[in-house]
UniProtKB/Swiss-Prot annotation:
Complex formation: Part of the 30S ribosomal subunit.
Function noted in UniProt: One of the primary rRNA binding proteins, it binds specifically to the 5'-end of 16S ribosomal RNA.
Originating species: Anaplasma marginale (strain St. Maries)
GO BP terms, alphabetized: translation
Name of the protein in question: Small ribosomal subunit protein uS17
Classification via PANTHER family: 40S RIBOSOMAL PROTEIN S11 FAMILY MEMBER (PTHR10744), SMALL RIBOSOMAL SUBUNIT PROTEIN US17M (PTHR10744:SF1)
Matching InterPro entries: NA-bd_OB-fold, Ribosomal_uS17, Ribosomal_uS17_bact/chlr
Pfam families membership: Ribosomal_S17 (PF00366)
């Protein structure tokens, strides 16, 4: 079990300097159709040392705002 504010996702875009986009998938139960649905959310994440590459599985953590859209940082890559 992970602590609050820590997520695991896959790096989908690593073209910008010190910023990566991470897709976090979760399974939710659909109320109407009574089926399990896969939901995805994409986060802009601060990567201070540009270590992450596309396809890496990373652990991200909530952080104080680094920019207008970045409120997460890479913990483990």
């Amino acid at each position: 079990m992970m602590s609050k504010g820590v997520l695991v996702g896959v790096v989908t875009d690593a073209r910008r300097d010190k910023t990566v986009k991470v897709s976090v998938y979760r399974m939710v139960h659909h109320k109407v159709y009574k089926k399990i649905v896969k939901k995805c959310r994409i986060y802009s994440v601060h990567d201070e040392h540009n270590r992450c590459k596309r396809g890496d599985v990373v652990k991200i953590r909530e952080h104080i705002p680094v920019s207008a859209t970045k409120r997460w940082i890479v913990v483990d890559s």
